[in-house]
């Protein structure tokens, strides 16, 4: 399973100060996430409360916290997919299945991705 890491955050407030300076701390957190150094990545990404923060929490099996963060995010295919994974791990199979099917409805490519993910495959066995 491949996760896409975003170095920007969707839905940022319009009064954000624009700068050409890269957020090196955030970039370092994403780099650590890509290197699978999840605890170190979470230490950096924790204040951002974005999708990459959710991925770090899921990678450390902090599934309830991941669900809390996902509840604050706009619904899209990726957030629904991540909700499905968290639900699967929390034993909430039917809820996870609904989230996965919604992810597929929002983006048909998620169906292919789900077929490669054993946690999603487990949801679909029902």
Feature-to-residue mapping (PLM):
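TPR/TPR-like (Sel1-like) alpha-helical repeat modules
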Residues: 47-50, 74-75, 88-112
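Helix-start (N-cap) detector for alpha-helical repeat units in TPR-like alpha-solenoids
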Residues: 22, 77-81, 111-112
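Long, contiguous interaction/recruitment modules in multidomain scaffold/adaptor proteins
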Residues: 1-30, 35-40
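TPR/TPR-like alpha-solenoid helical repeat scaffolds
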Residues: 55-61, 88-89, 109-126
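Generic alpha-helical secondary structure signal
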Residues: 23, 27, 64, 94, ...
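Alpha-helical adaptor scaffolds
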Residues: 27-34, 39-89
């Amino acid at each position: 399973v491949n996760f896409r890491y975003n170095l920007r955050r969707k839905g940022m407030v319009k009064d954000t100060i624009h700068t050409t300076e890269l957020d090196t701390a955030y970039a370092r957190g994403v780099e650590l996430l890509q290197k699978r150094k999840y605890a170190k990545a979470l230490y950096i990404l924790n204040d951002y409360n974005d999708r990459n923060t959710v991925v770090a929490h899921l990678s450390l099996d902090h599934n309830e916290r991941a669900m809390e963060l996902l509840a604050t995010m706009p619904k899209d295919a990726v957030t629904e997919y991540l909700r499905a994974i968290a639900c699967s791990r929390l034993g909430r199979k039917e809820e996870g299945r609904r989230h996965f099917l919604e992810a597929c409805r929002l983006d048909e490519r998620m169906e292919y991705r789900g077929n490669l993910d054993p946690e999603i495959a487990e949801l679909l066995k029902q």
